[in-house]
Regions:
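Short beta-strand segments enriched in small/hydrophobic residues
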Residues: 10, 45-61, 159-170
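N-terminal helix-turn-helix DNA-binding module of bacterial transcription factors
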Residues: 1-46
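An alpha-beta-alpha
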Residues: 149-194, 302-315
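Periplasmic-binding protein-like
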Residues: 51, 99-106, 161-164, 199, ...
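Short, solvent-exposed amphipathic alpha-helices that sit
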Residues: 65-80, 172-194, 208-212, 238-242, ...
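Hydrophobic alpha-helical segments within soluble ligand-binding/sensing domains
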Residues: 139-164, 178, 206-215, 277-295
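Alpha-helical recognition/docking segments in bacterial nutrient-uptake
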Residues: 48-152, 218
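Flexible loop/turn connectors
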Residues: 218-318
Length: 318
């Protein structure tokens, strides 16, 4: 044996640098420990608290499973990292609890709100809102690539329309342009297929999608575009309902592509072609970035852009 006290053995195995003991004794203690298959105990790190600020109310989140999926992914990923996540719906606190280690903000926030959040001087990451101009980290969807995928499909059609929605920031102070609409419009202009009269904007709901397509059918009649890009699946499903009510065949007469690949997209009839957004990646990558900030491992401000994928189903021609 090493002929030392239990306390000395413990301090050597815990690598206590303040302990005054010879190298030979240290080596002997480690040799004996290894022969006994000693494994150093891993200290459990204390749970760190994260504040998740949601731009929606709880009811609005129930109506929009896109943002619900992001939040749930963050909570599940947080458990694996010993993070305790508290969600505040549709509000920004005036002050923070001292033990809050970082903040994640989901949704769309005005410049004033971003400034308000930055004043807490805590690690801060925005999900689904590019805040590079405000010098804040963010994780967003790559809309450029998504629209390229839609355009590759739209190229098969001569007449093309768009059904979209308008959003405002959580405090209602800024109206936000939808990048899907702007990018799609620019791409159609470049291809010579842009028709301003075939672009319709309402809200991001099934009811709005149905109303917008009703309007398009009324205004265009037999010249109704043969292809519509819809800014989310809810709009596309509402549009499909309108077409079916008017006895207009999908996709034989009109093809539709949605956005997000929500859970219901595959179950409507015909099953909806859509751009798939990895909401789990948005949530988990956002949380990873926040933890990196909390650990001091990130230097410059970052925006991480998540790729999308076109899921072809029965609402577009083969």
């Amino acid at each position: 044996m090493a002929n030392v006290s239990t306390a000395t053995v413990s301090r050597v195995l815990n690598e206590d640098e303040t302990l005054s003991v010879g190298d030979e004794t240290r080596q002997k203690i480690w040799q004996i420990a290894e022969s006994l298959d000693y494994k150093k105990a891993v200290r459990k790190l204390p749970n760190r608290k994260i504040l998740l600020i949601h731009w929606y109310s709880q009811q609005e989140e129930l109506d929009d499973i896109y943002y619900q999926a992001i939040r749930l992914a963050m909570e599940e990923h947080g458990k694996k990292k010993n993070l305790v996540i508290t969600t505040l719906y549709q509000q920004i606190p005036t002050e923070l609890e001292e033990d809050i280690a970082g903040i994640c903000a989901i949704g769309k926030f005005s410049d004033g709100q971003v400034t308000q959040l930055k004043k807490f001087e805590k690690p801060l990451v925005f999900i689904d809102s590019n805040q590079m101009s405000n010098q804040a980290d963010s994780v967003t969807v790559d809309f450029n690539y998504a629209v390229q995928q839609v355009m590759a499909e739209a190229a098969k059609y001569e007449t093309i329309g768009f059904l979209g929605g308008k959003e405002t920031t959580q405090d209602q102070k800024q109206v936000l342009d939808d990048p899907r609409e702007l990018l799609f419009q620019a791409a159609l202009m470049q291809s010579g297929k842009y028709n301003e009269a075939a672009f319709y904007t309402g809200s991001f709901s099934t009811a709005s999608g149905q109303a917008l397509m009703n309007q398009a059918i009324s205004e265009h009649g037999d010249n109704l575009p043969t292809f519509f890009f819809c800014a989310n699946d809810a709009i596309a499903i509402g549009a499909m309902r309108s077409l079916q009510d008017a006895n207009i065949q999908v996709p034989e007469r009109v093809s539709l592509i949605g956005f997000n690949d929500s859970n219901v997209a595959r179950y409507v009839y015909p099953a909806l072609s859509t751009i798939q957004v990895d909401t789990e990646a948005l949530g988990s990558i956002g949380l990873n970035l926040l933890v990196e900030r909390m650990d001091g491992n990130v230097g410059i401000t970052q925006n991480i852009s998540i790729a999308t994928r076109l899921i072809k189903r029965e609402s577009t021609k083969k």
